[in-house]
Amino acid sequence: MKDLENIPALMEDIGKRAKAAAQQLATASAAQKEQALNAAADAVWAQRGEIIAANAKDLEFGRDKGLSSAMMDRLMLDEARIQGIVDGLRAVAAQADPVGAVLDEWTQPSGLRIQRVRTPLGVIGVIYESRPNVTADAGALCLKSGNAVILRGGSESLHSAQAIHGCLAAGLRAADLPEDAVQLVPTRDRAAVQELLTMTAYVDVIVPRGGKGLVGLVQREARVPVFAHLEGIVHIYLDKDADRKKAIDVVLNAKTRRTGICGAAECLLIHEDIADSIGKDVLDLLAMGGVEIHAEEGLPGPDSMQVATSEDWGKEYLDAIIAAKKVASIDEAIAHIRRYHSAHTDCIITENDAAVAQFFSELDSAILMHNASTQFADGGEFGMGAEIGIATGKMHARGPVGATQLTSFKYLVRGDGTVRA
């Protein structure tokens, strides 16, 4: 390893080793990758005490740094969350290997037999904030998809990430795969991020996972293609034909289950026909649950509601706060969402099939939901085992980015001495 003070040399060394490892990993068997991931899961559980101790150092660092309660929640690991990491690793291990899957095949009049086959991307750089579990999720998904990965976690999660990375390395060793297939940048120096964004000779794609500031920095300065995971400005629209119980259950879960995740609801739009009934009931229960409501003036609700300002529309709180507004129609709700959303996840609560069809047709978020909590906007809940993030762009990957989304394809063309006329 190069001197940690010489960041360009450090990152070039990491890049070279990642590229070499990617070439080996691309041809690794499905059984090897499955073995590596299960061995990593075993190591994480066996070393949970060490991981929690490392996390305690990060929590102290975060408190000293003045992190918000939402960021501290994202940073914290306990035995239950470590069990979640283990389960995620095993779920990815159990998935079908995407590499080598035949996506399409056909025969041309010339006699050429053509197959389109899934292949790894190569080397993926993942830049993320706070959540140490991303170390495991990203490492697992890149390994499953035959990609080498360079992980650059947040400065506040360095000790936790190092402990989890050690378990991934143990899994690679157990399966006789190159340890350089999953590397963690071993410094908090931000210059390492700048280097990673420009390593076109070694890195094939960058995946940023974090707040608007991080994603914006990556999009501005990266010379490598980017899968953008923007903030989750998530809307729920309560239609005039909403079912009361479904509305209450879905909205409360979408806002309060975990307030600091990107799938948490941030804005509630209520049709004026139900504002005095279902809408008020939902707002009353949110307030009783400790949620601070920033509402448009005149919206029926609890006395504790604050008057919303223009800054509340299009805001990702990541906290026990929600904006609320009355709308005259589904058209007004869709117009509001189009103006303020981040194309992440939006939801309609209704029993009207025509309203669902209009909502799904006229909005273009990566995930659109009907009568379901937006906290299901998660790769694990989509059956992907885990996710690197929710891609909100429109190129290549969109929605939860799992192992399959971390692949490309190539064409295999077979002839029999075939020549072109």
UniProtKB/Swiss-Prot annotation:
GO terms for biological process: L-proline biosynthetic process. Belongs to the gamma-glutamyl phosphate reductase family. It is found in: Cytoplasm. Keywords: Amino-acid biosynthesis, Cytoplasm, NADP, Oxidoreductase, Proline biosynthesis. Its EC number is 1.2.1.41. Catalyzes the NADPH-dependent reduction of L-glutamate 5-phosphate into L-glutamate 5-semialdehyde and phosphate. The product spontaneously undergoes cyclization to form 1-pyrroline-5-carboxylate. GO terms for cellular component: cytoplasm. This is Gamma-glutamyl phosphate reductase. The gene is proA. It holds the Pfam family Aldedh.
